[in-house]
UniProtKB/Swiss-Prot annotation:
Disulfide bonds: none annotated. This is Oxygen-dependent coproporphyrinogen-III oxidase. Pathway: Porphyrin-containing compound metabolism; protoporphyrin-IX biosynthesis; protoporphyrinogen-IX from coproporphyrinogen-III (O2 route): step 1/1. Belongs to the aerobic coproporphyrinogen-III oxidase family. Residues 248-283 are annotated as: Important for dimerization. The keyword Cytoplasm applies.
Length: 311
């Protein structure tokens, strides 16, 4: 493996090929799981440069709304959300490629999930390109199951182990910190992996890590869906799901870096906001019943912890 951080001449083509394949693979698997509804594809172009391929599934047997979006956009200047902590990026033109997905299930016992893998490069004449990878995946249950959390985090560990024993704890902690709703003082879910600004060792090494995380997502999510999708539920569980979806919407509209980047860079609004739940309910000063399964989400699952099963 090369130890140079030089960007290969065909880096964009390599990454784009992988991302399109990843989008296809995930969509085929989700359609197979759902068994009723197929993805609607919407290809789009961005006037300032680039475009994408948005795929949306709605009102399925298993998935109430699922979006799997590929985008490849470029521009003359990075928006503030991407350059605020990297002053050396000022005045550089950029390219950004990624696959981002959010899945909102019908059954409240099936968790919502989000995953994203992406690549940025910022270039300037007579200067070396500045590039990095980012992404991760995280899980947002409404009703917690220890075995699901353990499986999710074990799969996250498996994605990271080929790249060293320090990667998983670092990316896990980063995920816990990132997906925290500060104004509510609570986590969005039970975490997973999150990383950004990653360009360690070489392009090949960094690209392989991004691919590993992308490829492990469906391995983490599919078994959980299979275990929970047929559990009976009623109005109480659906109401709690819609209430908790409000937290999801709050995070995405207030804090999410990808949402801010997309809106600030003149991205396609429909694709950027595909992450929002189809139905949401806010209730003033609501609190779960003492000892209820709803309360256990707050006490036993949302606080950050080590979910790896002890041997």
């Amino acid at each position: 493996m090369s130890i140079s951080k030089t960007l290969p001449y065909n880096a964009i083509e390599q990454i784009k090929s992988y991302l399109l394949q990843l989008q296809n693979t995930i969509c085929v698997l989700l359609e197979s799981i759902d068994g009723k509804t197929r993805f609607h594809e919407d290809s789009w172009q961005r006037a300032a440069g680039g475009g994408g391929r948005t795929r949306i599934m709605t009102n399925g047997n298993v998935f109430e709304k699922a979006g799997v979006n590929f985008s490849h956009v470029s521009g003359e200047q990075l928006p503030a959300s991407a350059s605020a902590h990297r002053e050396e990026l000022a005045g550089r033109h950029f390219s950004a490629l990624g696959v981002s997905l959010v899945i909102h299930p019908q059954n409240p016992y099936v968790p919502t999930t989000h995953a994203n893998v992406r690549f940025f490069v910022a270039e300037k004449e007579d200067s070396e390109p500045v590039w990095w990878f980012g992404g991760g995946f995280d899980l947002t249950p409404y009703y917690g199951f220890v075995e699901d959390c353990e499986h999710w985090h074990q799969t996250a560990l498996n994605a990271c182990l080929p790249f060293g024993e320090t990667i998983y704890p670092k990316f896990k902690r980063w995920c816990d910190d990132y997906f925290f709703i500060k104004h509510r003082n609570e986590a969005r879910g039970i975490g997973g992996l999150f990383f950004d600004d990653y360009n360690e060792i070489s392009f090949d090494h960094s690209f392989e890590l991004m691919r590993s995380i992308g490829d492990h997502f469906i391995l983490a999510y599919e078994p959980i869906v299979a275990r929970r999708k047929d559990i009976p539920f009623g109005n109480r569980e659906k109401a709690f799901q819609n209430y908790r979806r409000g937290r999801y919407a709050e995070f995405n509209l207030v804090y999410d870096r990808g949402t801010l980047f997309g809106l600030q860079s003149g991205g396609r609004t429909e694709s950027i906001l595909m992450s929002l739940p189809p139905t949401v309910h806010w209730e003033y000063n609501w609190h779960p019943e003492k000892g209820s399964d709803e309360e256990k989400l707050y006490t036993d699952f949302l606080p950050a912890k080590d979910w790896l099963k002890k041997e």
